[in-house]
Amino acid sequence: MGMEFDKYIRLAHGSGGVETSAILEKLIFSRVEESLKRVGNGVGIDFPDDAAAIPLPSGDYLIVTIDAYTVNPPFFPGGDIGVLAASGSINDVLMMGGKPLAMLDSVVVEEGFPMDDLSKILNSFIGVLKDEGIALIGGDFKVMPKGQLDRVIITTVGIGLARKPIIDVPRVGDKIIVSDYVGDHGAVILAYQLGGDVSMELLEKSRLRSDVKPLTRLMLPLVERYGDYIHAARDPTRGGLSMVLNDWAKVSNTVIVIDESSIPIRPEVASFAGMLGIDPLYLASEGVAVLSVDPSLTDEVITYMHSLGFSNAKVVGEVRRSEKYSGYVIMRTVTGGFRILEPPRGDLVPRIC
């Protein structure tokens, strides 16, 4: 299987987990000269983050991010691919400590796709930009012959400015904060993809909705007040909370210890994931921030997040030094034991975002 897996592209290569990291390293990162992986003393593909930072003569940094959105289905409870495409790139700029300013988009549509559906999607997309005061400064539009593309794909480039970018390197002693329930978006998309009575019952009875939204009203005031004390920030999209924490543990050469009972997960999400044998910490969120914060200000930061309307924000773990478990995430389970939280492997939920 290993040889076959290396010979052909699989869905798992795009899942945001271990296989994604491996193929990017093999086909892209290893082929780019070190001096061309960033601009000046900025941040680029030399560092595992969702955006790049380019130093400007003024001392500020230009924050740039790009993402392709292929979510299936394109309409789902709580949003659609248009809301997702706008919010996703806005959030990637925000997590780098930037203020989003502008966006470009590329829309590729399958021949025969309903015009009314495309109009709704683009209304959603432009509506988010209007609400956030973000300019749409360019883009591209193409149509593929029927059967050569599944409905619609939107790619967005987000652009912002940061006084000091947040470069994700958690420090020993930091507390890990999650801003809201995790896994909602992933559970909704997975339920729709699986179909069947059980999945539809989950959506109908629980009224579960995707959490997709821009995190501007959280991150801009938070960075303004506590930016120097936030040592890492990420939105747990593909690969979920598990992938974020594993990335951080690896890049900081630390062990991150989290408490399962402290992680905010809706009971219906936990139940649905458990029924499928999936750890909900692998499910994507599209309106959640994960932060690594200086312990001296953790309580103050949590209180401030609550005042901003994020009442479910809480500490879920901490960053520790460990020779034996450096680069790992360890979870204290609800039964009092410990287990290693592995990074996601395989293709748990295809086309989740």
Segments predicted by a language model, with ranges:
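Helix-biased detector of long, well-ordered alpha-helical tracts
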Residues: M1-C353
